[in-house]
Amino acid sequence: MIDYLRVKFLRFFLLAIATVLICLGLAAFQQERIEASDASETTIASTTWQHGSFPVENFQSYTSPFGYRISPIDGKRQFHNGLDMAAPLGSYVRNWWTGKVLEVSDGTVCGTSVKIQSGGWQHVYCHLDGHVETAANGRYLLDRSGGIQIWQGQELPVGARIGRVGMTGRTTGPHLHWTLRYNGSYVDPALVLKEMFKQQA
């Protein structure tokens, strides 16, 4: 009888632990949820993209899409907030849309990067060659070998060369990590590129 009660208690105890672990996992998943974009496929399809520029020269392939994935760095499930585009090291990166440089940065997982504002859109270019320097009149991204100097606050035309594909930050190979936000929410860059190509064809 005592063995029977022990087995029953053990089963109840294990079931309780499993329930707690599942609830904790679901809570973590809820916290991990990323704010959905208000740039729906309909909005993207109804926007004129004819003047946009593909963001990388010597493009080879898309290596990691937008959305949840298993990280190639640590093997954990994570939200990948952009689109990875492989290109040979040193390939030039071009400004997708006319806009103002909000920030140049380095020393993060994004590596050397440029963030540009174009109306309600923000576009970020990560893992660039070079580094950020500070002068009396502000901060700027410097890539001497590529002839690139981009200042925070600078207005940039569409298609301008703003950097080169590098290996800065957390990366497993040379590529451009390109992130888009519309009114503060992430947007799948592949949807925008697809519509852009359709309109430019």
Residue map of PLM features:
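Short acidic/polar mixed-charge low-complexity motifs
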Residues: S91, W121-V124, S185
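Surface-exposed, glycine-biased beta-strand/turn segments
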Residues: Q30-S113, S118-G119, H131, P157-V158, ...
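Acidic, glycine-rich catalytic/binding loops that coordinate metals and/or anionic ligands
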Residues: W49-Q50, L102, T134-Y140, G147-A160, ...
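Histidine-centered divalent metal-coordination motifs
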Residues: H80, H127, H175-T179
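Active-site region of chymotrypsin-like
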Residues: L83, Q117-W151
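N-terminal secretion targeting segments of exported proteins
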Residues: M1-A45
